[in-house]
Design a protein with these regions (language model features):
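Hydrophobic alpha-helical transmembrane segments
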Residues: 107-114, 118, 143-206, 279, ...
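Membrane-helix boundary and inter-helical linker elements of multi-pass secondary transporters
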Residues: 9, 76-77, 103, 134, ...
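Juxtamembrane intracellular "pre-TM" segments in multi-pass secondary transporters
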Residues: 1-14, 201-238, 261, 327-336
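Substrate-agnostic recognition of the 12-TM MFS/MFS-like secondary transporter fold
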Residues: 14-32, 56-94, 109-168, 235, ...
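Juxtamembrane transmembrane-helix termini
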Residues: 40-43, 104, 108, 197, ...
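Alpha-helical transmembrane segments of multipass membrane proteins
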Residues: 96-100, 164-165, 192-193, 223, ...
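Extracellular/periplasmic helix-loop-helix junction of adjacent transmembrane segments
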Residues: 33-64
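C-terminal transmembrane bundle of multi-pass solute transporters/carriers
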Residues: 52-54, 59, 66, 77, ...
């Protein structure tokens, strides 16, 4: 069995691990600070708050759908390490705009920076997975993928916690995010420094040449069709897409769910986001232990079913929760209430199962195709992922506008998990 921890001592893995960790940390530091500031400090209407959360999620995801084909081609054609350095430099500039939005409490500036960070992540996303087969041995790829996924969610945890803590309340009851504005710029600078040490990852000189297509629509169609015609890749990509769509719905609804269904404040919303992040990180590392380094989908169906069962139990508990009191409950008050720890346990269970579901599928994508095509394969996956995630957020936004409660939206996730389990089973039969 390949122990993943030894990779954290290697020069060929640590720089990309730290760079992607800091990227995830900063994404979520900014997004959490933005959402907390807007929901608790600017808006006062539950429907407006839920709609904002869904729109913000959609704006971040939209660039993945539009620009992933260009990002994948670029990563396969050029040195991936050089692209990392360019992208991390851009992050500093984007966070200057985001910091201004936080300081001025300017919603358009915040949404602009959020969309720009989506573009940043679109170009970095294919690299953080596609670079692994170039720097790691074949029996290390699953371990490396698990660590990257775990690092991503630990970064989400850290950024989420700090983003929630740095949105502070003034004596007059208003909120500010001054320290969050400083933090997002500082983290972007550190990420650029770690990106400087990523080892070179040039394109394969023996790979067949391909024509770089700058036409966004045509390139996207060609890339997706060229990838999805392979049945195993089709099943893996659709299964991953269902996971991310479910995650998008859950993440978008955590703050309004906590405030409007559970009657709790931003500290509880931060706990929910943090719990989810820890769970995915635990599942990402645990699955490598279970599989012994083997790239296999044999646990995917059970993991997806477990996700659905935990979501259903979460829905059941939220439905019978006492609801709002005279004022929003803080973290200690919430945790002292009957059933609160079971809600947290359900969230943790959903996340652990999710990490165990998705990590082998990513490893499968990067090991099934030649190294010269890994970035484009991940990019095709990102296009399909983002398309389904945007569709999910649109459905969620429409459902909220039609009067569906935040709690009832959990049923959408539970239903999607059954389809994810079926896809995981089909992939297991096709590949294992």
């Amino acid at each position: 069995m390949q122990n993943s921890m030894h990779l954290l001592r290697t020069r060929r893995f640590v720089p990309i691990f730290l760079t992607q960790f800091l990227g995830a940390f900063n994404d979520n530091l900014f997004r959490t600070a933005m959402v907390m500031l807007v929901i608790y400090g600017i808006y006062r209407d539950p429907q407006q708050e839920a709609t904002f959360s869904a729109i913000a999620g959609g704006l971040f995801i939209l660039p993945f759908f539009v620009l992933s084909a260009l990002a994948g081609q670029l990563a396969d054609e050029r040195d991936k390490a050089a692209i990392v350095r360019i992208v991390k430099t851009a992050e500093i500039l984007i966070m200057l705009v985001g910091a201004a939005g936080l300081l001025l409490q300017n919603v358009p500036a915040l949404l602009f920076a959020l969309c720009a960070m989506g573009i940043h992540s679109t170009f970095f996303g294919p690299i953080k997975y596609a670079i692994l087969p170039q720097h790691l041995r074949g029996d290390e790829v699953l371990a490396g993928t698990g660590l990257v996924e775990a690092g991503t969610y630990i970064g989400i945890l850290g950024g989420t916690l700090l983003g929630g803590v740095l949105v502070l309340q003034n004596p007059d009851g208003s909120f500010h995010a001054k320290w969050a504005a400083v933090a997002v710029i500082a983290v972007a600078i550190v990420g650029r420094i770690t990106g400087h040490f990523v080892p070179p990852a040039p394109p394969d000189p023996d790979a067949p040449p391909f024509h770089f297509d700058w036409h966004i629509v045509r390139a996207s169609i060609r890339l997706v069709s060229a990838t999805l015609h392979i049945p195993r890749l089709f099943l893996a990509i659709i299964a991953i897409s269902f996971f991310w769509a479910m995650g998008a719905v859950l993440a978008a609804q955590f703050p309004p769910l906590v405030k409007n269904a559970l009657g709790a404040d931003q500290t509880v919303a931060t706990l929910f986001l943090a719990t989810f992040s820890v769970g995915v990180a635990l599942g990402s590392v645990a699955i490598n232990r279970l599989l012994g380094g083997e790239v296999s989908a044999k646990f995917a169906p059970a993991a997806a079913i477990a996700m659905g069962l935990f979501v259903l139990d979460l829905y059941r508990r939220v439905r019978v929760w006492p609801g709002e009191g005279p004022e929003l409950r803080d973290l200690s008050t919430f945790l002292a209430m009957d059933g609160s720890w079971l809600i947290v346990f359900d969230l943790l269970g959903v996340a652990i199962a999710g990490g165990m579901f998705v990590v082998p599928l990513y490893a499968f994508l990067t090991t099934t195709v030649p190294k010269s095509e890994t970035a484009r394969t991940i990019a095709a996956n990102n296009i399909v992922n983002s398309g389904l995630m945007v569709f999910a957020t649109l459905v969620l936004t429409g459902a909220v506008m039609m009067g569906v409660t935040v709690a009832d939206s959990l049923l959408i996730v539970a239903a999607a998990s059954t389809l994810a389990a079926w896809l995981g089973w089909k992939l297991h039969l096709a590949c294992d």
